[in-house]
Amino acid sequence: MSQGIADCLDPIPRYGEPMSKVKKLLHTRYRVNDLERTVQFYKNVLGLAEVRRHKSPRGSELVFLKAPGSEELIELCCFPAGGPVQVQPDLTHLAFEVESLAEFGRHLTGLGLKYSDGPHASADGGGIAFIDAPEGYEIELIQEGRQGH
């Protein structure tokens, strides 16, 4: 039996039902050039905790960080053999919830930093703002409104 033209052009592959589904997201990797500078930013500016660090079999230096109240980890990877990291603007970002954008803004000011964009208030009392992390990655900070995110 021949396939119809629509079946041949279908951009969504049909894999069938998985035998075993994933359980949860464990970590997301971000490659960086200056591992220590980036680790210090995430720890001192955002308050993340270093969970572990090691060297991979391929020679990458890896540091795993955890945000308060989260299970998922951020894996920072420095792999000099791969060449310098060049992050495309507006391609990727991490988003973190904060209690208060105003309070976090004061924290930034105390560190000699500032928001790169925002804060922008929403009608429900929440808002968003952005800061630039080392290596060109963007960090979105979200203050939940009365209705939630």
What are the roles of these predicted feature ranges?
Residues G4-K21, K24-D34, R53-H54, V63-P68, G83-H149:
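Vicinal oxygen chelate
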Residues R29-E71:
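Core segments of cupin and vicinal oxygen chelate
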Residues S70-I74, G136-I139:
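Short, charged/polar, Gly/Pro-enriched secondary-structure boundary elements
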